[in-house]
C-alpha cells in the first residue's frame, strides 16, 4: 500500500512538457509539411517565427488579459480568431480546431492552421514576433546547416 501511495505521488509530480524541437529538426518537419515557400514565405521565415513565438516549444501558451484570449503552440495561434478553447469570449475559430490540438507534439494541425492564418490578407504579418524579429532581416541562419 505504501508503494502505491509513493508511486501516485511520483506520478503527480511529473510535469507535462511538450516537444521542444531542435532548429534543424523543425526546419525539416516544416518542409515535409509543405511550408517551404507556402504563399511565398520561405522556410527560414517560418523557423524564425517559431523561434520567437514559442522557442520551438509545442506546449507554449500565453494568456492575453485584454481580450481574454490565449496563444497556443509552436506558432502561438490565438484563441480569439483561430481556435476554440471554450473560454475566449466571441471566438471565431477560423481554423475549425480545438486549441488543444495546437499543443500536440505532432505539429501537422498547427501547420494546417498556420496556412489558414497566412491565407488572410495580413499574411505572416499577423504574428507580432515575426514583424519584430524576422521581417526585413536575413533569416537564412534559421535553416543554415540543416540540409533543407
Swiss-Prot record:
Keywords: Antimicrobial, Bacteriolytic enzyme, Disulfide bond, Glycosidase, Hydrolase, Secreted, Signal. Residues 1-18 form the signal peptide. It comes from the Eukaryota. The active site is at 53, 71. SMART domains: LYZ1 (SM00263). Monomer. GO terms for biological process: defense response to Gram-negative bacterium; defense response to Gram-positive bacterium; killing of cells of another organism. Residues 19-148 form the C-type lysozyme domain. Lysozymes have primarily a bacteriolytic function; those in tissues and body fluids are associated with the monocyte-macrophage system and enhance the activity of immunoagents. GO terms for cellular component: extracellular region. This is Lysozyme C. Lysozyme C is capable of both hydrolysis and transglycosylation; it also shows a slight esterase activity. It acts rapidly on both peptide-substituted and unsubstituted peptidoglycan, and slowly on chitin oligosaccharides. The keyword Transmembrane helix does not apply. Belongs to the glycosyl hydrolase 22 family. It comes from Papio anubis. It is an enzyme of class 3 (hydrolase). Its EC number is 3.2.1.17. It is found in: Secreted. It catalyses: Hydrolysis of (1->4)-beta-linkages between N-acetylmuramic acid and N-acetyl-D-glucosamine residues in a peptidoglycan and between N-acetyl-D-glucosamine residues in chitodextrins. InterPro entries: Glyco_hydro_22, Glyco_hydro_22_CS, Glyco_hydro_22_lys, Lysozyme-like_dom_sf. GO terms for molecular function: lysozyme activity.
